[in-house]
Amino acid sequence: MRDALFAYSPKGSNNLYELAALGEKTYFIDCPTRIGIYRINDTDVCLIDSGNNPDAGKKVLALCNEKGWKITHIINTHAHADHNGGNAIIQKRTGCRILANCYEQCMITHPRLNNCCTFGGRTPMELDNKFMLAESSASEQITDENIPEGLSFRLFPGHSFDQIAVMCDDGTIFTGDILCGKSTIEKYHIFFIRDAAEYEHSAKEICETEAKVWCAAHYPPIYSKDELCELARLNIEKMHELLNVIKEICADGKIFEDILKETLDHYGLELSFNQYAIAGSTVRGFLSYLHDIGEIAVDIKNNYLMWRNCDGETN
């Protein structure tokens, strides 16, 4: 999800769905949500994510058929619809196994849970679209035993509940949405974060990994540790900027809808329904985080839930 809506778009439509090499065994398919490929052997491959909709799945199937490759596995970094939109059609045509982690695995099998988590309840029909709601696919909990040989995984939550990165034995790491791309940050300022504390921790942790290349879903591959760490720094810096903006907005106590509006106005944003739901989820999560660390208080007045900055208060 969610970076498909606040996201990098591949430059040059002629390059869409072309195969590009990363390492000795790894490739990516350039498309709105990049699809990773790990070559298990001469005939079998594992996908890392499956694209943002069924059409992406069809194009990946055609490409793999052309190469003589059989898709035996899909590993989803997380459950957002832009990362598993091709799951169902690929699984129907190949019988491949789909592996994901904990909550992500559950939400891939039951995708409406994902939208409920974002919106905070049953979603209106306008949000039941291909950008927000993937078709259900049968997924399994990923383990060290069922992941294809040559691959491993590691937990990097924050953007989503139980997002993982996929580590390949040729030095490639597929990072999903652990970090947001620079162009998206500069254009939209607000990007999807489920948990601020976990997001910052994961941004720092990915900088501790060793790889030849880090391949994310929504921005070009990174081949330099310094470049990766600079992007992580930018993500953390922007997140804290947004937290401070929200704190300032809450100086006199405000309801959520006013906080969200003033945050969007601060950055000069006018959003679609999809984007509004996503930005709203991020801002709600930030309010909860600020409350839990004691920087924002919650009051109920006249049946309004008010969020109020605690600066200057003493116990």
Question: Where do the language-model regions lie?
Answer:
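Metallo-beta-lactamase
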Residues: 52, 152-240
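C-terminal regulatory/interaction regions
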Residues: 248-315
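Divalent metal-coordination and catalytic microenvironments
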Residues: 25, 38, 49, 78, ...
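Positively charged, polyanion-binding regions of nucleic-acid-associated proteins
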Residues: 236-254
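Active-site HxH/HxHxD metal-binding segment of metal-dependent hydrolases
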Residues: 26, 54-147
